[in-house]
Amino acid sequence: MSKIVKVIGREIIDSRGNPTVEAEVHLHGGFIGLAAVPSGASTGSFEALELRDGDKSRFLGKGVTKAVSAVNGPIAEALIGNNAKYQECIDKIMIKLDGTENKSQFGANAILAVSIATAKSAAASKGIPLYEHIAELNGTAFQFSMPLPMINIINGGKHADNNIDIQEFMIQPVSAKTIKEAIRIGAEVFHYLAKVLKANGMHTTVGDEGGYAPNLDSNTEVLDLITEAVEKAGYILGKDITLAIDCAASELFDPLTNKYLLKGEGKIFTSQEFTDYLNILTKKYPIISIEDGLNESDWDGFMYQTKVLGNKIQLVGDDLFVTSAKILQQGIEKGIANSILIKLNQIGTLTETMAVIKIAKNAGYTTIISHRSGETEDTTIADLAVGTSAGQIKTGSMSRSDRLAKYNQLLRIEEQLGKKAPFNGLKEVQSQA
């Protein structure tokens, strides 16, 4: 019943209007798994390769027909007849067939789409939800938790057409007792923030991830507006709601001068000065998580940043670790950061992703399952967060259906699991920071 009989790839459109890969895996007995992969805007240098056509006559060169052809050709031929229940085996077949370290032959977008579709088809054949199947694959059957969300409410950097340098300003509803309550709190603050922005004569258009994207003079002005919105929504900042930021500092780094540029504020920092600047922000505002606080290659700087901030807050590696077991292990050995952002398409298979989560947890690092700025309606990351008990999830704001699809899936999962999947709130962040 779990034997693969057909694999189909197709080119579909993501939330930015760019092509991406969707795959179907069909099993004997009529079971089907469907998966679509996302795409990032600010990407780490060592991510698995997202294969694009480069044909400027189609989608400005961003077509994915080569990746789709890989799915419909060599990948399909290699997988037909194999058992979809053996996820690791399926993923290893594709990795070996690709034959490159960064999946550049077929593209991580092709391989990941099939990897996830395989897991979904196997879950369907077993008659169980995807999160339950993932927990079984993870060796943690029937062990679930609901993730604390990082809700993006103001976009900047590469995710918005504005002058804000820091890429994401997020809230975490830490006083919530359930994911349902956390989402409600997030939505309320999101709406009150719109009122605050309008009252200050600012527009409320949104960026790639659904957060508002106004033009503001400084990062502190952003944080002050969020503070006002939280208070007007009836919550206490630092008690009910905490803050998180994604600096995406590789995008702020100037390799010619080895300096960090906040163009919106007209400020220039050395590596140590930028960490000191972030430290000042954490003292003024209840920021308990900072992602990519320095350039991905600034490991000496990260050692200093971890020394200064690592015992106080969560320091998240995204571009720093790119969901790579090898790079994460190096970071652990050097004592860099204390948390990792998990993005399926940075590594390219479900099996490798779960392995990285295990390595991080065993080292005492927190794990945050994440979307990308170019998303689809696929909700796999919600199931992955619950099935691996990752602890936290980052999937955008309270607008754009590509973001809300994941939140709504979490609501369904919580309804299904009830007390079997506790919502641990702030404990998920504090356990390592």
From Swiss-Prot:
Gene3D superfamilies attached to this UniProt entry: Enolase-like C-terminal domain, Enolase-like, N-terminal domain
EC id: 4.2.1.11
InterPro entries, per the entry: Enolase (IPR000941), Enolase-like_C_sf (IPR036849), Enolase-like_N (IPR029017), Enolase_C (IPR020810), Enolase_CS (IPR020809), Enolase_N (IPR020811)
Domain of life (superkingdom): Bacteria
GO molecular function: magnesium ion binding; phosphopyruvate hydratase activity
Residues spanning the signal sequence: none
Pathway: Carbohydrate degradation; glycolysis; pyruvate from D-glyceraldehyde 3-phosphate: step 4/5
Keyword Transmembrane: no
Cofactor note: Binds a second Mg(2+) ion via substrate during catalysis.
Residues binding Mg(2+), per UniProt: D246, E291, D318
Catalytic activity as recorded in UniProt: (2R)-2-phosphoglycerate = phosphoenolpyruvate + H2O
Cellular component terms per the entry's GO annotation: cell surface; extracellular region; phosphopyruvate hydratase complex
Residues that coordinate or bind (2R)-2-phosphoglycerate: Q167, K343, R372, S373, K394
Cofactor list: Mg(2+)
Places the protein is found: Cytoplasm; Secreted; Cell surface
GO biological process: glycolytic process
Main location: cytoplasm
Role according to the record: Catalyzes the reversible conversion of 2-phosphoglycerate (2-PG) into phosphoenolpyruvate (PEP). It is essential for the degradation of carbohydrates via glycolysis.
Family named by the database record: Belongs to the enolase family.
Protein name: Enolase
Provenance organism: Baumannia cicadellinicola subsp. Homalodisca coagulata
Organism ancestry: Bacteria, Pseudomonadati, Pseudomonadota, Gammaproteobacteria, Candidatus Palibaumannia
